[in-house]
């Protein structure tokens, strides 16, 4: 199936393809790590299958702070190698997917000359480690310059700020780009396909029993593979338990939440890195007509797809914004949308969540099952390369060299032409470029409305539920007026026409998304749960 089009109508054919042959590699997990591994392995010439229990990027990989950053704060934790890798990987992503690496000035207030000296020393190291070009190195702003650059900031008592460029992304679209690229290179990929058991031959992992989790599908297949990689993110330990019941957990889960406001309510021009009351750094990030704030970092007991958000989480972020920004007091009713995600960190007993390293780690079980946990969105490509290097070694395979640092991701080609063609559309054009890159021109040519996006989500991007489009293909759940609720009915109609949904199924899909939105807003004060959508 060497095509970029992930057609949600062709699932029956994909199910058949999964059991027709023995693959070199089966990847369990369709987040950024699994998607990166599948793409790398397929580009090297291995036969690859990937299954995801829900939708691609439905876990951690759609709930991040949506940044490709070098991890400056990890220098203070001594993670030099992590910073070097993440800083270098930023430049690679900028090259292979420029539409998914939007450069943005980050401003960090400095309270004293001593803190300025310390910060600059860290930035010099960061820039050297990451090969940052001269034109993109940091600059120091005095108080007057700081106030002029970001008028909403409270600059009293500060010694100015440091400005340096980092990159923003759309995390779910980055996953999807890797999935589509993997399929174009020959991988067989499928969402809503859960690994329920592992297969063994002579004590070695030899595949998985996979069952559909999609309403109306009853498919169950045995996928045979010479090697299995567990890249299930927060569900990594659950997959490891399929190999050996009672296996010692490797992960420590941490929850992070984000709040979204109308840009008119929080009209900043730069990404701001602010100190919260507990000395943690939080981000305030402009994105189109919206501004989002995050994140928290607290241990969380379970690997939920939709983690519970608490009133304490919300209040913590609101207090940080109020402390630093000269804006009328933000209240729950100002919140347009909010999301929470769970980070799959490597367990380090005795440490607070924000102290746990973001390094990745690879384990190989006695049966040969390879598991990878931890890591950062910024370094996904390098993480994948390490895993595939190990796979090639274990299989003693003849494989091509890693090509993921050079091969462009879908949407990279034709980007400047599309940007020029869509420039007259203003913010809407920028939104489409951020989602589709060079492919945005065809979206506009087809009409560019919700129905066009929703149809494309089905025919080219593997969407088979309304949630897939609303949350992960379009980001309307986070970055749209009224949390994108007004898009649900027309999107359901467009998807339903392709997927054979009757009126009741369309209504059920809309109700499901509406319930998810209410679940997220349940953390707000009762009088604000139906507000904030203006």
Task: Report the location of each language-model feature.
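Glycine-rich beta-alpha-beta "Rossmann" dinucleotide-binding loop(s) and their flanking helix/strand
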Residues: 182, 239-257
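Beta1/beta-strand and adjacent pyrophosphate-binding region of the FAD-binding site
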Residues: 19-33, 49
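Core beta-strand elements of the Rossmann-like FAD/NAD(P) dinucleotide-binding domain
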Residues: 21-23, 216-227
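Dinucleotide-binding Rossmann-like beta1-alpha1 core, especially the glycine-rich loop
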Residues: 66-149, 282, 417, 427
């Amino acid at each position: 199936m060497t095509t970029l089009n992930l057609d949600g109508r062709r699932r029956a054919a994909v199910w058949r393809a999964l059991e027709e042959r023995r693959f070199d590699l089966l990847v369990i997990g369709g987040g950024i790590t699994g998607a990166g591994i599948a793409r790398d392995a397929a580009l090297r010439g291995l036969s690859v299958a990937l299954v995801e229990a829900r939708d691609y990027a439905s876990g951690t990989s759609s709930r991040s702070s949506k940044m490709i950053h070098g991890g400056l704060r990890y220098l203070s934790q001594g993670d030099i190698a992590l910073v070097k890798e993440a800083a270098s990987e930023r430049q690679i992503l900028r090259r292979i997917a420029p539409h998914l690496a939007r450069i943005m000035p980050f401003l960090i207030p400095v309270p004293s000359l001593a803190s300025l000296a310390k910060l600059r020393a860290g930035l010099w190291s960061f820039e050297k480690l990451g090969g940052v070009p001269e034109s993109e190195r940091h600059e120091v702003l005095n108080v007057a310059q700081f106030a002029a650059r970001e008028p909403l900031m409270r600059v009293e008592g500060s010694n100015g700020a440091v400005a340096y460029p980092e990159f923003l992304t759309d995390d779910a679209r980055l996953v999807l780009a890797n999935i589509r690229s993997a399929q174009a290179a020959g991988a067989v990929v499928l969402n809503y396909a859960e690994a329920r058991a592992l297969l063994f031959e002579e004590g070695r992992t030899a595949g998985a029993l996979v069952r559909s989790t999609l309403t109306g599908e009853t498919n169950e297949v045995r996928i045979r593979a010479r090697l299995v990689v567990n890249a299930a993110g927060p569900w990594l330990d659950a997959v490891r338990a399929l190999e050996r019941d009672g296996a010692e957990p490797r992960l420590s889960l941490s929850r992070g939440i984000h709040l979204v406001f109308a840009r008119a309510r929080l009209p900043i021009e730069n990404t701001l890195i602010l100190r919260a009351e507990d000395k943690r750094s939080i981000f305030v990030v402009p994105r189109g007509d919206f501004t989002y704030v995050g994140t928290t970092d607290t241990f969380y007991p379970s690997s939920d797809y939709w983690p519970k958000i608490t009133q304490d989480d919300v209040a913590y972020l609101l207090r940080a914004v109020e402390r630093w920004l000269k804006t009328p007091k933000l209240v729950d009713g100002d919140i347009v949308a909010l999301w929470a995600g769970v980070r799959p960190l490597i367990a380090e007993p005795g440490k607070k969540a924000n102290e746990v390293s973001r390094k990745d780690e690879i384990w190989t079980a006695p049966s040969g099952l390879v598991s990878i946990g931890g890591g950062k969105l910024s370094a996904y490509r390098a993480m994948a390369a390490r895993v595939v290097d190990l796979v090639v070694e274990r299989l003693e395979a003849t494989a091509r060299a890693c090509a993921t640092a050079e091969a462009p991701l879908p949407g990279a080609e034709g980007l400047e032409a599309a940007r020029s063609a869509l420039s007259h559309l203003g913010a809407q054009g920028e939104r489409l470029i951020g989602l589709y890159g060079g492919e945005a021109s065809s979206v506009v040519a087809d009409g560019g409305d919700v129905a066009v996006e929703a149809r494309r989500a089905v025919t080219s991007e593997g969407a088979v539920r309304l949630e897939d489009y609303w949350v992960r293909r379009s980001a309307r759940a986070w970055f749209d007026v009224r949390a994108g609720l007004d898009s649900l009915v027309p999107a359901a109609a467009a998807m339903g026409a392709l997927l054979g949904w009757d009126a009741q199924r369309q209504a059920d899909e809309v109700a499901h998304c509406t319930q998810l939105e209410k679940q997220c807003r349940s953390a707000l004060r009762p009088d604000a749960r139906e507000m904030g959508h203006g």
